């Protein structure tokens, strides 16, 4: 259950606080990452892929749906996975700003488990999760360009 919420938007709060305390110069990069990821994900879900159903709407035999207590099963706005985009955006952000090598495998496992959990709790298809990873990658690259161009003087 915890991993299913690994990419919840609230994860940005401790990321913001830690960046503010220890890596203040990267705050614009973090904010750009949050904004880019949110805009790309939500515009995709609400405008471009609005009719994309989730597994619960597609699989007619409810016995095949794995249910987890505490997880509300949604039926629409599946593509891309916003939780996965958030988890991978945070992971990639940490990779960019940290010199510590252990961040890469630990962060990758965190993000990957978050994406896998979205499939496990029947909230997304694997393609939705893959698209969430792509959103994160594009968001982090765009945010880095913005950061370098406007804030890294």
Where are these regions (language model features)?
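Loop-to-helix transition at the N-terminal end of transmembrane alpha-helices
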Residues: 2-5, 30-35, 130-133
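Membrane-embedded catalytic cores of phosphoryl/pyrophosphoryl-handling enzymes
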Residues: 21, 62-153
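Alpha-helical transmembrane segments
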Residues: 3-6, 10, 27-30, 102-109
